[in-house]
Amino acid sequence: VASHVPVILSSSSVFPEPTAATFEMAATVGYDGVEVMVWTDAVSQDAGALQGLAKHYGVPVLSVHAPCLLVTQRVWSPDPWERLGRAAQLAEALGAPTVVVHPPFTWQRDYARNFAQGLAKVQARHPDTTFAIENMYPVRMAGRTFVPYVPGWDPTEAGYDAYTLDLSHCAAARTDSLEMADRMGSGLKHVHLGDGTGEGRDEHLVPGRGNQPCAELLRSLSSRGFRGSVALEVSTRKVTSREKRVQDLRESLEFARRHLAPAGSAAPAVTSDVRRG
């Protein structure tokens, strides 16, 4: 009996390869779908192009990551509300049920001041979409620590209807992902699977290569009543070939399927085909 939880591939996991390569590698390895990180790659912003890729490779888009990164502050618009609205429209066009959202940066004063109310308005305009706020982490530089998010890096302190649990961010924050999941409670709607060592930076390691309780967290999802997707969000930018990138993505998928599988059942097989690039 296979787990009902889809395991999907974030387009950030194939960087620096483009968004289109995500669909190819997801199909090659056997992921259940894709999470599109909206950023400067034009394809990531284009519903028609993404629909074409999903159809060609037979891999649906199951979540959209709104352009919340430092490098995406001018994707679509410098206005963060416009960016979030466009991300919601993109998700609807693709049939993706979830939009991942970061808490506001400290310098986004107006956005931060009205974030809860504005989010409620966006939710009202897109009632079938889940806007899942992601846990972040404090930044440590030159022996100093600061939090670039308002009201903080832990969204459960403010309280939202839906959350994305990022395990690599838990490691960077030196917190336990099981405890974070407990704080999120029934609001846990989406997972970013990765790992980290707790060195104070965001590493996005292949699950099992750090010290987060990745296996335990995945095994706990069934008892938590989780009905969302698990998106692999790892860094493969330093690998030396497409083959090695695919190997990391395959290892990660096998890890996820193994620990999501109900007790006493076998995890679904992972595709062995490797396309060299």
Residue ranges of model-derived segments:
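Structural motif corresponding to the early beta-alpha repeats
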Residues: 32, 36-113, 226-227, 235-239
